[in-house]
């Protein structure tokens, strides 16, 4: 697995159209999307750097939106299904939940924050599973454009953990708290040894896992 440099990590991004999302999220939550770099044909670009600053610059609900936009990219056909989290949860409940989770992160309880968002737990939101709520954790835990302890865990990272490290892990999740804690320990340990950002490890595993998925 080859680890990307800082510039490659921060520029990791996708094209999208703000209009796909602004009509599907609570009023005001998607306004920042029009501020992102514009491209042709009403497209804009969202990069990992934008995700890392979303919570600080715009707010926690906006960080959740940013994670969905970044994680969906140009796949317009997926937007309707993925935006159900905003349609089927009360906006105040979402806001309260995200603030509670962010406070748990702030005091250093990363795994507890993850646990609280799992199905059946206190901060769980309908339709919001680990692949996307770990994007929120990653964004909310960031500081000055760098990750905190929280990292993204999705199907591609899971596939790479199985392939590269031989983990007995389901590709599609959901993943229990002990698996998330193990992933964080593993990624941060590799980052220390290799002298790279922890999210460079996550991106390397994501890239490898996506390659595996495309070949299967």
Specify the residue positions occupied by each region the protein language model found.
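Short acidic alpha-helix initiation/capping motifs at coil-to-helix transition points
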Residues: 39-46, 111-114, 181-182
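Structure-specific DNA junction-binding interface
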Residues: 1-82
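C-terminal accessory module of base-excision DNA glycosylases/AP lyases that mediates lesion recognition
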Residues: 1-29, 134, 141-216
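Amphipathic alpha-helical segments within well-ordered protein domains
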Residues: 52-53, 87, 188
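Short, hydrophobic/amphipathic alpha-helical patches that form generic packing surfaces
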Residues: 61-77, 135-139, 159, 203-206
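Generic detection of long, well-ordered alpha-helical segments
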Residues: 57-61, 91, 177-184
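Helix-hairpin-helix/helix-loop-helix acidic hairpins
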Residues: 56-59, 66, 71-125
């Amino acid at each position: 697995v080859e680890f990307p440099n800082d510039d490659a990590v921060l520029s990791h991004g996708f094209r999208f159209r703000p209009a796909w999302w602004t009509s599907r999220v609570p009023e005001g939550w998607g306004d920042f999307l029009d501020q992102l770099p514009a491209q042709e044909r009403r497209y804009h670009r969202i990069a990992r750097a934008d995700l890392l600053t979303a919570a600080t610059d715009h707010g926690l609900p906006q960080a959740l939106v940013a994670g969905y936009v970044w994680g969906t990219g140009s796949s317009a056909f997926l937007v309707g299904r993925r935006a159900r989290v905003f349609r089927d949860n009360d906006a105040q409940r979402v806001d309260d939940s995200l603030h509670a989770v962010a406070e748990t992160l702030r005091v250093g309880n990363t795994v507890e924050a993850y646990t609280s968002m799992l199905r059946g737990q206190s901060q769980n939101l309908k339709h919001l599973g680990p692949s996307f709520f770990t994007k929120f954790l990653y964004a909310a835990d960031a500081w000055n454009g760098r990750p905190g302890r929280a990292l993204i865990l999705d199907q591609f990272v899971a596939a790479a953990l199985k392939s590269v490290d031989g983990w007995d892990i389901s590709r599609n999740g959901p993943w229990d708290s002990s698996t998330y804690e193990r992933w964080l320990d593993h990624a941060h340990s590799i980052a220390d040894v290799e002298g790279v950002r922890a999210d460079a490890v996550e991106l390397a595993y994501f890239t490898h896992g996506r390659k595996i998925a495309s070949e299967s």
